Swiss-Prot record:
Its main location: nucleus. This is UBP1-associated proteins 1B. It comes from Arabidopsis thaliana. One of its GO terms (molecular function) is RNA binding. PROSITE patterns: RRM.
Length: 382
């Protein structure tokens, strides 16, 4: 049985080998036939070419023989037809000659955009527009990929303020390396700094990150608040110190010349005939004038009363006992206010208003003329 099985296997193998041989032979025959057919086709083409050339040469020979042989006199009809043909051919040749392209000047309407402007002219033209108008013009006319937009992006990338970020909320143990590692995810960083305390050597809680491109800074600012080493950190675009809108200029303040005779506004007081050309505002000037009354030992140039609205106690509080007693100024002559030592302000102001007995240092209950006035005058004349 085993021998029969082996024989069957051998027979099957032989059959397979025969089939493969036949298939290979058939393929080889097909390849040979293709090659032979290609050769025949190439030969037939080569044979056709000389035949065509022979036909052409025969035609040329016939034409030459006709030209050499004397032609019989043509009939008048044929001569007319030949003349017409010659005329047509000459007309066609003339038309062909005239069909050459002729440059004709095209009339165009010139506009301002066709001229080439100077840089100064463009600058003057742009200065007439406001900032908002220029922004709207660029925003509407510029398209993605245009030269204008690319120039804007290039200038923004060159500007460090467009790529710099301010980070706050950092821990005291934050270092430059930690901050750089946290923000490298958004783009390449050119500079990174953490502000340190000189005394302790620890971080103050804020720092700066400068990206190489504006794209990285914008990616970092998409989410202003971030988690960094178990802390909430906030990011803001860093701006230079002098950037932004200019500070509003203060309105120019006129130099005010105030006279004591001016009673329209009792809150505005100054010494007569003195022009304060310091450019101070009215509130500051009022405070300065009141301090001049309270802190300077100046006579009032013959005026019997201080300016209206003046409280004599204000002079005592500001440290000038002389001004505190101005209610009794009419009883002295001019030039006597600056003579002799001064009494402390706590007593002088009270004596000027509330004089009731002869003791200068005491405080009385009544007002009017009496021994108190004489005591006060004696104190001034000491």
């Amino acid at each position: 049985m085993a021998k029969e099985g082996e024989e069957r296997k051998k027979e099957k193998k032989e059959k397979k080998e025969r089939k493969e041989r036949k298939r290979r032979e058939a393929e080889e025959l097909a390849v040979r036939e293709k090659k032979i057919s290609k050769k025949h086709k190439s030969k037939s083409k080569e044979e056709e070419k000389p035949e065509k050339s022979k036909k052409k040469s025969k035609k040329y020979e016939e034409v030459e023989e006709e030209e050499k042989s004397p032609s019989p006199s043509p009939s008048p009809k044929k001569s007319k037809e030949s003349k017409k043909k010659h005329k047509r051919s000459s007309d066609e040749s003339e038309e062909i000659v005239d069909s050459k392209p002729v440059t004709v000047p095209i009339v165009t309407i010139e506009s301002d955009s066709d001229f080439e402007f100077d840089k100064e002219d463009i600058k003057n033209l742009l200065e007439s527009y406001s900032k908002e108008e220029l922004i709207n013009l660029i925003y509407k006319t510029a398209e993605k990929g245009s030269k204008l937009i690319s120039a804007v992006f290039e200038s923004a990338d060159r500007d460090s303020s467009q790529r710099n970020i301010f980070v706050r909320g950092l821990g005291w143990d934050t270092t430059h390396e930690n901050l750089k590692a946290a923000f490298e995810v958004y783009g390449e960083i050119t500079e990174c700094s953490v502000v340190m305390d000189k005394d302790t050597g620890r971080a103050k809680g804020f720092g700066f990150v400068l990206f190489k491109t504006r794209k990285g800074a914008r990616a970092a600012l998409k989410n202003p608040e971030k988690r960094m080493y178990n802390r909430t950190v906030s990011c803001l675009p860093a701006r230079p110190f002098n950037s932004g809108k200019p500070r509003e200029q203060q309105q120019p303040v006129e130099s005010v010349k105030i006279d004591l005779s001016h009673t329209g506004n009792q809150s505005e007081m100054a010494l007569p005939g003195i022009d304060l050309g310091h450019g101070l505002d009215k509130g500051h000037q009022q405070q300065q004038n009141m301090s001049m009354y309270a802190g300077q030992n100046m006579p009032f140039y013959g005026h019997s009363q201080p300016p209206p609205g003046f409280n004599p106690m204000y002079g005592a509080m500001m440290g000038n006992p002389m001004v505190a007693g101005l209610q009794n100024y009419r009883m002295f002559g001019s030039g006597m206010m600056n003579q002799g030592p001064m009494m402390p302000p706590n007593h002088m102001g009270m004596v000027g208003q509330y004089v009731g007995d002869g003791n200068v240092n005491g405080v009385g209950a009544g007002a009017g003329a009496g021994a108190g006035f004489d005591g006060e005058r004696a104190w001034y004349l000491r």
